[in-house]
Amino acid sequence: MADEYLVPLDQYLAAGVHIGTQQKTKDMKKFIYRVRQDGLYVLDVRKTDERLKVAGKFLARFEPQSILAVSVRLYGQKPVKKFGEVTGARAIPGRFLPGTMTNPAVKNFFEPEVIIITDPRADHQAMKEAIEIGIPIVALVDTENLLSYVDLAIPTNNKGRKALALIYWILAREILYNRGEISSREEFKIPVEEFEMKIVRR
């Protein structure tokens, strides 16, 4: 059964991909596996895995440089940056400057053909501009997110350090695999730790 998953189920669980929040939206109901006694909603990892397979095939159809990945969230910044390095996609870790996709006068103006949003709520500016220019939106969504304007939702813990690293690592591997740049998933030798934001303890 483990073979059905892109990574062993234990790896998803160890990274906390399934850990949601204590809030849920009607939109996300279909992705929720159960609610714990403490009120925390748990995501269905099988659905996460299925959506990652679909997203990998979908994103592989685009020219690498026409894909944009964004994350305002701190723990998503290293995964997004590494994802860009590995796949050739454009990455904007940190603050998303208003007008980046809509105003040619902005310094780093860029018109992507598809965008990957780490959190629709935190990345609201990028989301707004993607809607404005009418490009497909692939979004990592947690139990409290809305799916309005999201074309392809990947249900996951979109706040956790290890969860975000694993999701972007799998997505990068799937894109390379579906592009034919690697002939098997085992050929992808970059460790998931390279996608992980490091905690600096003072």
From Swiss-Prot:
Gene Ontology terms for molecular function: structural constituent of ribosome
Any GO BP annotation: translation
Keyword terms, alphabetized: Ribonucleoprotein, Ribosomal protein
GO CC terms in record: small ribosomal subunit
A Pfam family reported for this protein in Swiss-Prot or TrEMBL: Ribosomal_S2
Similarity annotation: Belongs to the universal ribosomal protein uS2 family.
Protein name: Small ribosomal subunit protein uS2
InterPro entries associated with the record: Ribosomal_uS2 (IPR001865), Ribosomal_uS2_arc (IPR023454), Ribosomal_uS2_CS (IPR018130), Ribosomal_uS2_euk/arc (IPR005707), Ribosomal_uS2_flav_dom_sf (IPR023591)
